[in-house]
Amino acid sequence: MRQGAPARGRRWFVVWALLGLTLGVLVASAAPSSPGTPGVAAATQAANGGPATPAPPAPGAPPTGDPKPKKNRKPKPPKPPRPAGDNATVAAGHATLREHLRDIKAENTDANFYVCPPPTGATVVQFEQPRRCPTRPEGQNYTEGIAVVFKENIAPYKFKATMYYKDVTVSQVWFGHRYSQFMGIFEDRAPVPFEEVIDKINAKGVCRSTAKYVRNNLETTAFHRDDHETDMELKPANAATRTSRGWHTTDLKYNPSRVEAFHRYGTTVNCIVEEVDARSVYPYDEFVLATGDFVYMSPFYGYREGSHTEHTSYAADRFKQVDGFYARDLTTKARATAPTTRNLLTTPKFTVAWDWVPKRPSVCTMTKWQEVDEMLRSEYGGSFRFSSDAISTTFTTNLTEYPLSRVDLGDCIGKDARDAMDRIFARRYNATHIKVGQPQYYLANGGFLIAYQPLLSNTLAELYVREHLREQSRKPPNPTPPPPGASANASVERIKTTSSIEFARLQFTYNHIQRHVNDMLGRVAIAWCELQNHELTLWNEARKLNPNAIASATVGRRVSARMLGDVMAVSTCVPVAADNVIVQNSMRISSRPGACYSRPLVSFRYEDQGPLVEGQLGENNELRLTRDAIEPCTVGHRRYFTFGGGYVYFEEYAYSHQLSRADITTVSTFIDLNITMLEDHEFVPLEVYTRHEIKDSGLLDYTEVQRRNQLHDLRFADIDTVIHADANAAMFAGLGAFFEGMGDLGRAVGKVVMGIVGGVVSAVSGVSSFMSNPFGALAVGLLVLAGLAAAFFAFRYVMRLQSNPMKALYPLTTKELKNPTNPDASGEGEEGGDFDEAKLAEAREMIRYMALVSAMERTEHKAKKKGTSALLSAKVTDMVMRKRRNTNYTQVPNKDGDADEDDL
């Protein structure tokens, strides 16, 4: 009874409120309507159940007389209607309402109308009580800090070494008359003794010309150039590499002197000092030189600081350690300023030397991989997860720390980690955070060692300090000391690191997505629950004002509802097709002046051929079966009503035009759900070991070995000089040695004699070489043949002169004498008659004068050579001779006849 009293009070309050509202409506309806109110006559027929006025034209339709409508032009609102007394004028001035409604239905074909009968109370519902919302999931035990990640050091230990050896070459040559042939070449490499390295090479920059070594358990000695022992100067190599230098004593190979048809031997000893790179890998029991030579001794072996326990495979007399050794630069002859401890080892092929250093500070089995400024440590079950956005990686470790004492040769880990952490802290966190304790070390999956320094902000640090002081005051004064570490006597081991980091990156991706999704779903669930509880309170109050809308939104379909105390009675609404609904164009009540309908009147059919039902348009396309929504008519009336998929606009209680939903600005009532989308995260390329590290991890660099072996001849030998075998070399060598023993005078005489002999030998050698050349022999043969041919023709000509001088000297004249057509010929031939004595005398005279002319020309030619006086004498002689001779002959014409040309 106590609980029902307030409810009855509220119901009586509602009843009295409705009664007062009804009286107000009646008083307002009794007032006369405005004389200028349009549409009264048009609405009268519709209100009395008459036919509705046709609908106005659709928006955007052009007038009847305009053949070219403009596109995208909104229809102009119709002119204000005339007074209600002229219904025909109103119908003619306005477009029909039915055409407008057809256009709206065509644009929104999915809009339906509903007829909702009043609920009877047969079905009642109630709202659920507010639920208890879940709490937001708390995060894990997160700790921020600085981390340095270490990986296995696969790089070898590198150091500089010096090789001392002598290349011994013994060549056997057989000399023929025109060629030389190698019958055998023996090459070997001998080590340099310790004394020669220290006293000769390092002290003076010289090397002995002999090589003493053991082969097949026999000690043998090789002499350079097959001569006695001397000191040879070391000179830089021809082509030095970027990583090493070299020195040697000779460029050319020594070949024996030429002695034909004999086998000769020649020995070359080339002392070579070469700086090379050496490398050794864990456990550092041996090292290899850049030349490919292995040394089966630890590079840290020695006689100091317990290094004699390191591995060695050689006898004790083959090794020597020199303290206070000052190395010398063989190029500049400069001596080092600081002494070193020098190790020297002799092998059967070479002697190697290097500077000794202790093993502990020099090598480390772990190396620094990544420095992480922000590393987040979280606890998941029985493991720690170290995550970093900078490297997109998550490492999983145990909850217990990993002692550094278990890492073999791990002295560098603590130092490198502290240096990196101090540098990062000073750069980023010095003003905002403090360090919590000492660095912690954890062994992660995959063989990564994580050095982690936890950090704490200054604000939290102050709170923790206060709480710590408070707890310390409650503890007993003498706490028990912690037990010693269980790993104090643990054996050392080497950590093996995997070459791939993909598993850690996949773990990071999974953790990133899991954390984001879980946090997002947790926030969504909490927000959704709280929102539902808030809306439930609003719905409980809103159902009292509009139970139909609240019930429809709750049930999910159109229903009608009314309150029955604290519950709602609901009834299902019947859908009506949009084509079966017609709206009236007037909202005035003709029988009651001053009263108007507050919502438009409609006529509809439940079925296409069913009877017409009169009603009133409700909210949200609801078709009310009653027309009791009445209000007093007011001036300046403007209303928009939802009709189908759009709106109809009434002005002064008369239809004006229709609008689509797009013409009305929409105000959203939805609350945006603040869900953070998964952020884009780019994975940067991350390599545990680079290609250079992997390539450099081996003990032997085959590329460097091949390069050095192929450059050896180029560096320590002259490959461009060619020595030709000379048969006279032995003779010249003997003459040179003979004159060398006679002092300075003998050397001077020897130079002259050897020069003359050399010229003669060169000339003979030149002729011999020319004759030995195929082209030279051919040329000589051709010249000999040409000489023989010339001698033959000369001999023949002389014989002709002796037998017939005239025919030999004057062959053309002789031919004319033989020609029978010549009128001067006697016609008798040589066989007929005797010669003419007169003509014979003339011929003899002509020959005598020809000899005289020839003598005069020779005299004149000689006078020209001797000078002017002789020339004058020749002229005078010529004049005398001209006066003495008689011109008893005529000059023979120079032109030959055609017959002579034919004879020729």
From Swiss-Prot:
Residues 1-30 form the signal peptide. GO terms for cellular component: host cell endosome membrane; host cell Golgi membrane; host cell plasma membrane; membrane; viral envelope; virion membrane. Residues 31-774 are virion surface. It holds the Pfam family Glycoprot_B_PH1. Disulfide bonds join C116-C573, C133-C529, C207-C271, C364-C412, C596-C633. Residues 173-179, 258-265 are annotated as: Involved in fusion and/or binding to host membrane. Residues 31-52 have a biased composition (Low complexity). It is a single-pass type I membrane protein. Residues 53-66, 476-485 have a biased composition (Pro residues). Changing P80L: In strain: Nonneuroinvasive mutant HF10. Residues 796-904 are intravirion. A motif (Golgi targeting) lies at residues 849-852. Gene3D superfamilies: 1.20.5.1890, 2.30.29.100, 2.30.30.1230, 6.10.250.3280. Residues 719-772 are annotated as: Hydrophobic membrane proximal region. One of its GO terms (biological process) is symbiont entry into host cell. The chain crosses the membrane at residues 775-795. HAMAP family: HSV_GB. Homotrimer; disulfide-linked. Interacts with host receptor MYH9/NMMHC-IIA. Interacts with host receptor MYH10/NMMHC-IIB. Binds to heparan sulfate proteoglycans. Interacts with gH/gL heterodimer. Interacts with host DEFA1, DEFA2 and DEFA3; these interactions inhibit viral infection. Belongs to the herpesviridae glycoprotein B family. Envelope glycoprotein that forms spikes at the surface of virion envelope and binds to the host cell entry receptors MYH9/NMMHC-IIA and MYH10/NMMHC-IIB, promoting the virus entry into host cells. Essential for the initial attachment to heparan sulfate moieties of the host cell surface proteoglycans. Involved in fusion of viral and cellular membranes leading to virus entry into the host cell: following initial binding to its host cell entry receptors, membrane fusion is mediated by the fusion machinery composed at least of gB and the heterodimer gH/gL. This is Envelope glycoprotein B.
